[in-house]
Regions:
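AMP-binding/adenylate-forming catalytic core of the ANL superfamily
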Residues: 115, 132-134, 302, 415, ...
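Conserved AMP-binding/adenylate-forming
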Residues: 52-57, 69-115, 127, 136, ...
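Gly/Ser/Thr-rich phosphate-binding loop
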Residues: 300-304, 313-380, 391
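Conserved pre-ATP/AMP-binding loop-to-beta segment of ANL
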Residues: 178-215, 222, 245-252
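Conserved structural elements of the adenylate-forming
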Residues: 63-68, 193-196, 207, 226-246, ...
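Conserved AMP-binding A3 loop
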Residues: 58-60, 211-235
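AMP-binding/adenylate-forming catalytic domain of the ANL superfamily
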Residues: 157, 536-561
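Conserved AMP-binding/adenylation subdomain of ANL enzymes
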Residues: 234-252, 260-303, 307, 311, ...
Length: 575
């Protein structure tokens, strides 16, 4: 009897069988992010690059606007190596600003406009910005946040700056600007005009140049600024060219994600522009209107989070609509239970879509995406296969000892989209970026999962979401969520840990449930049925201690389930 030798993902790379050899062998561009967009679209300058509430910008328009913005940045004293803090939603101006800063060797520090004065102040001070760019609607908070910093000038833009003329008038009537601006404020159009006569020469390509700093809790929970380079952005876009059966020049992508997360800029702006798409900009999504926006614009592509697609599947406005235009609607940023995945896939199939929900997995530290399940290369429950130039493997948690395919461990990522590091946090950078004996730099994600024999990645849970019982048994929330979400009355569910009342240490799994709006099932009946399902399908130590019904899941500002809030909301009376 022979013993089969273990197979290791980092060596076997079984996922490569799904890719064309020309993409496996491709070299990554040695260009700035802006130059890559220009290079890819040099023969398509009259194609539409951006659509902002019906106002269209061609690629030629975009390039002109970027160069004008670059000149304007130089006009206010920005130079190579400077970091400009931007507090805004996605608008054409913010997109031009990204590429303009890139062109002159500067960096954007992207901050969520919903942050408090203290939060904005902290992020300005951390990178020592001398220039602040903000939306007019958050100017007062930004003015206060800029106190006791080195900010010298503030550029203020309005969501109306690029609206079609009639809409711009309507916006200004319904949302008048009542700010009292300080003397150091420059309005956007005045800012652009101030760049006249300044140089529009691009800085030479620098492989070490940081395009943006985006902020994340990362794997330890403390706020950190993730530095992403031109190479990170370009490598992400270049790898997506391997999905050429789905992605074709001239298609539309609706960008519903904000600019202050890597997902919003890397997948929502740079990727589609490199592929020659039209980017439909939705600066401030109302989730209830997502279905109407999909019907209005008919985008073939969209990147969102699982909650967006559950919203679409439950939207009565889409009940009898033809959605055959959908090619790649991708869910990332949060876990998608098997029940929710099946619900969304049934919805897509019933409305004429050719492919199931596309899934991806990644993190800010790898420029948002590391795996893709696109088209028919898709297994239920998985988050797809590694991108063509990316390697993923499972390791014994916290070590460099790789585990064989099929064994659960800490998922680690190695590839060209890996961040440069955390801004001014060398110790924390060293914790997550580690050179292994194979010579590669690996990102230690803090996520538990495994790869199957075909190279599909299956995600169990973040290590920090893992529930450890009093007896040391480990419970992954996804184990329970995958069972509970299949109940026909359940719209959404999330599992968190609660205190074990019978032991001095350890936690127990607690299930939150949102019922479907049209369900007629009684709550007590649903609980009895869920208890039976869990008893039949899960080990004894994984059984939930209690179930609680809520009207909706609390969400973080970027659309992920707020697990910390769910944990805080558990009362001793609930179980």
């Amino acid at each position: 009897m022979t013993t089969q030798n273990p197979v290791y993902a980092s060596q076997a790379k079984p996922w490569l069988k799904y890719y064309d050899q020309k993409f496996i062998d491709q070299t990554l561009p040695t260009l700035s992010a802006f130059d890559f967009v220009c290079h890819r679209n040099q023969n398509h300058l009259n194609d539409t690059a951006l659509d902002y509430y019906g106002r269209k910008f061609t690629y030629a328009d975009l390039i002109v606007n970027v160069k004008k913005t670059a000149a304007a940045l130089r006009g206010v004293g920005v130079k190579k190596g400077d970091i400009v803090t931007v507090v805004s939603v996605m608008t054409p101006e913010v997109i031009a600003l990204f590429y303009a800063a890139d062109m002159i060797g500067a960096t954007l520090n992207l901050v969520d406009p919903r942050y408090s004065v203290e939060g904005i102040h902290e992020y300005i001070e951390e990178v020592d910005s001398h220039l602040l760019v903000c939306l007019n609607v958050v100017y007062e908070r930004c003015r206060q946040a800029a106190k006791r910093t080195n900010v010298e000038k503030v550029i203020v833009l309005s969501p109306a700056d690029s609206l079609p003329p009639v809409m711009a008038v309507g916006y200004k009537l319904t949302t008048p600007d009542k700010n009292k601006y300080a003397s150091n404020v420059i309005r956007w159009k005045q800012f652009i005009k101030g760049g006249e006569g300044q140089s529009i020469a691009a800085e030479p390509y620098d492989p070490d140049h940081t395009c943006i700093v985006v902020h994340t809790g990362g794997t330890t929970g403390s706020p950190k600024g993730v530095m992403l380079t031109d190479n990170c952005f370009n490598a992400l876009a270049q790898q997506f060219r391997a999905y050429d059966k789905l992605f074709h020049r001239g298609q539309k992508l609706m960008n519903i994600m904000p600019p202050f997360i890597a997902y919003g800029y890397a997948c929502g702006v740079h990727l589609p522009l490199v592929l020659g798409f039209t980017v439909i900009i939705i600066p401030n999504l109302d989730p209830a209107k997502l279905g109407s926006l999909v019907l209005k614009y008919k985008p073939e592509h969209m990147f969102g989070v699982p909650a967006h697609y559950q919203q679409l599947a439950a939207d009565p406005k889409l009940r009898d609509k033809d959605l055959s235009f959908i090619l790649n609607y991708a869910a990332g940023g949060d876990s998608l239970s098997r029940g929710a995945e099946q619900t969304v896939n049934d919805f897509l199939a019933a409305h004429g879509a050719r492919y199931p929900i596309a899934k991806g997995y990644g993190m800010t530290e790898v420029s948002s995406a590391a795996t893709v399940a696109a088209g028919l290369d898709n297994k239920p429950g998985s988050v797809g296969i590694p991108m063509v130039n990316t390697i993923i493997a499972a390791f014994e948690p916290g070590t460099d000892r790789e585990l064989p395919i099929g064994e659960r461990g800490e998922l680690c990522i190695s590839g060209p989209t890996t961040m440069k590091g955390y801004y001014n946090k060398a110790d924390e950078t060293a914790m997550i970026l580690r050179r292994h004996p194979d010579g590669r730099i690996w990102v230690h994600t803090g996520d538990m999962g495994y790869l199957d024999e075909d190279g599909f990645v299956f995600l169990d849970s973040r290590i920090k979401r893992m529930i450890i019982r009093h007896d040391g048994f480990k419970v992954f929330p996804s184990m329970i969520e995958n069972v509970v979400s299949r109940h026909p009355a359940v719209h959404q569910c999330s599992v968190v840990g609660c205190t074990d009342k019978d032991h001095v240490q350890g936690r127990l799994p607690f299930v939150y449930i949102v019922l479907k709006a049209d369900t007629t099932a009684k709550k007590k009946q649903v609980i009895r049925e869920l208890e039976r399902m869990c008893a039949e399908e899960l080990p004894e130590y994984v059984q939930p201690v209690a179930y609680k019904f809520i009207s909706s899941m609390p969400m973080t500002p970027v659309g992920k389930v707020d697990y910390r809030q769910l944990e805080a909301d558990i009362s001793p009376r609930d179980y």
